């Protein structure tokens, strides 16, 4: 649990996620501001359905991605690599996620883009501030944590 708490605290301080999807052998990546839900271990993002990445995702798809800062030295590198599943939210689930997203990013109130959830199933957190190459791993299905 300690690993997930550490990762969640770091993710809560960031705000841009890069995620990638594939369809019929074609890969595509995108960036978005995100809201992180530590209880569900999921990102919430807004993106229009007409975008290439949304079209490739369909209602639900496998996803992989990263969250990272922009440090000036190797010793300060911190970042997450993940894999999971992206899906478009509907109904009350979408409404609740949008309310939380709008609290974090008030400018989003002007956007009508659908809300998507990226559920994280595997997370690898690299934190060179704890020592070069220090990694922490969390897996949803097994509840496994490695430091």
UniProtKB/Swiss-Prot annotation:
InterPro entries in the cross-refs: Split_barrel_FMN-bd, UPF0306
SUPFAM superfamilies to which the protein is assigned, alphabetical: FMN-binding split barrel
Residues of the signal peptide: none
Top-level lineage group: Bacteria
Disulphides: none
Coiled coil region boundaries: none
Family: Belongs to the UPF0306 family.
HAMAP family, alphabetized: UPF0306 (MF_00764)
Name of the protein this chain belongs to: UPF0306 protein YhbP
